[in-house]
């Protein structure tokens, strides 16, 4: 029988674990490790004059179960391969497994949060709605990452709306 971990004990255990299984041979069910950029990478890719600008190398996400919060940074370069990799980094089953270690018999709050390029999405509810939170989190993560703007110069970005040439030819 596993004991319910509360307060400081829970935080200490969470700090000792990473989403990839962490120290001491524990397994949390999450497949990818934290991929936070080094201080040098962070300085190169951030505008120091704008402290609100996110690092363009990836995104931050977290799962919270009561007072225990698992955070990580994943690299994401907006390619199809990268999208499939980060979307497959956890499933509802792996979240349920990780949560079951901290939820115990009492209903506590569960929260998923993701921040990418200045947009932050947070989904929360009670532990009895965890499966629904997982489904919403997967959908939100996929939509947020797929809707990332592609930096391509177009007629619109140069001040000329698309079809301007066609309109000019027809009027002549």
Swiss-Prot record:
Residues 1-37 are annotated as: Disordered. GO terms for biological process: symbiont-mediated suppression of host innate immune response. Homodimer. This is RNA silencing suppressor p19. Residues 1-20 have a biased composition (Basic and acidic residues). InterPro entries: Tombusvirus_p19, VP19_sf. GO terms for molecular function: RNA binding. GO terms for cellular component: virion component. Viral suppressor of RNA silencing which binds specifically to silencing RNAs (siRNAs). Acts as a molecular caliper to specifically select siRNAs based on the length of the duplex region of the RNA. Keywords: Host-virus interaction, Inhibition of host innate immune response by virus, RNA-binding, Suppressor of RNA silencing, Viral immunoevasion. Belongs to the tombusvirus protein p19 family.
């Amino acid at each position: 029988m596993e004991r319910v971990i509360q307060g400081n004990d829970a935080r200490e255990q969470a700090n000792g674990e990473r989403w990839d299984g962490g120290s001491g041979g524990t397994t949390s069910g999450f497949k990818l490790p934290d991929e936070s950029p080094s201080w040098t990478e962070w300085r190169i890719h951030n505008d120091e004059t704008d402290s609100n600008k996110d690092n363009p190398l990836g995104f931050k996400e977290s799962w919270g179960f009561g007072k225990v919060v698992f955070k990580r940074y994943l690299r994401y370069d907006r390619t199809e391969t990268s999208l499939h990799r980060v979307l497959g980094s956890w499933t509802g089953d792996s979240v349920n497994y990780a949560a079951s270690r901290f939820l115990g018999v009492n209903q506590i709050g569960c929260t998923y949060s993701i921040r990418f390029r200045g947009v932050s999405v947070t989904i929360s509810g009670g532990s009895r709605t965890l499966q629904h939170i997982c489904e919403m989190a997967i959908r939100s993560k996929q939509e947020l990452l797929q809707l990332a703007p592609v930096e391509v110069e177009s007629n619109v970005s140069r001040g000329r709306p698309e079809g301007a040439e066609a309109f000019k030819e027809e009027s002549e």
